[in-house]
Amino acid sequence: MDNSNKIVFVSGARTPVGRFGGSLAGTENHVMGAHALRAALERGGVPAGAVDEVVIGCVGQVGGDAFLARRIALAAGARPESTAVTVNRLCGSGVEAIRSASLEL
């Protein structure tokens, strides 16, 4: 079997859950997301440069976070040629991101 076109889910990770004004208040969204993405890639044994697309679920991105998945992917070491998709389905964003990614397979 030719593995050059093989598409797989390798792992998943989520950002920490904090409280309003808590210890994570000064951490930018894309920095936290990049930590989660790097952790998922490390768990799956995949180098960041091998990623073709990143799908991230996030609620309420605005301003500099309008294309949060792209910022996360680049901060985690993905190639500039890779693509990224941010899914905003309010409370269901994470689950919808998984569903959307699976439909692309």
Where are the language model's segments positioned?
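Active-site-proximal alpha-helical scaffold in enzymes
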Residues: 89-105
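Short pre-catalytic strand/loop immediately N-terminal to key active-site residues, enriched for Gly-Thr
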Residues: 81-91
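Conserved "HGTGT" condensation-loop signature of ketosynthase/thiolase-family condensing enzymes
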Residues: 1-82
